[in-house]
UniProtKB/Swiss-Prot annotation:
Domain of life: Eukaryota
GO biological process: regulation of phosphatase activity
Annotated gene: Ppp1r17
Protein name as catalogued: Protein phosphatase 1 regulatory subunit 17
InterPro entries: PPP1R17
Post-translational modification: Substrate for cGMP-dependent protein kinase. Phosphorylation of Thr-72 and Thr-123 is required for its phosphatase activity. Phosphorylated by PRKG1 isoform alpha.
GO cellular component, one term: cytosol
Tissue specificity: Expressed in Purkinje cells of the cerebellum, hippocampus, pons, medulla and eye.
Residue ranges with Basic and acidic residues bias: 62-73, 111-124
Disordered: annotated segments: 1-79, 98-127
KW Phosphoprotein (keyword) present: yes
Function: Inhibits phosphatase activities of protein phosphatase 1 (PP1) and protein phosphatase 2A (PP2A) complexes.
Keywords assigned: Phosphoprotein, Protein phosphatase inhibitor
Amino acid sequence: MSTEMMTTEPVPPLELSDDILGKLDPQCSPSDDLSDQFIKDCDLKKKPRKGKNVQATLNVESDQKKPRRKDTPAVHIPPFIPGVISEHLIKRYDVQERIPKAKSGPALHNSDMEQKRPRRKDTPALHMPPFVAGLTLLRDESAGVILEDEEMDGDKLAI
């Protein structure tokens, strides 16, 4: 290893005479348009490579033959009818008998609708104490009616 450091001195440009430049490329002269000549030379030298171009054409053909995802038809599964299950449906679609989620029961459905609907002002709110497992309610803690202040004083207020 040498311990000398490399210097970064500028190197003088290589001086070539006009004779040497003329001998290097007889087709080119300073007055010629190099871009046109370059395009002509490239057109002559273009030869299709067998390996890469053949694979590219095969890929284009295979893309055309393959159906795209948006073109593939959806698999049709018949609508579920409760109580009507055949062995054919079970084998083909792996369908198990189940209750649809939308219709859980008429009693539960009505209570949900009543809670979502705004109640009328003349209807008192029913207070249900929270359910605690293992705890029995005393008589005075049973479900009761809570009247709002407006409802109690409604007759006295004149609007």
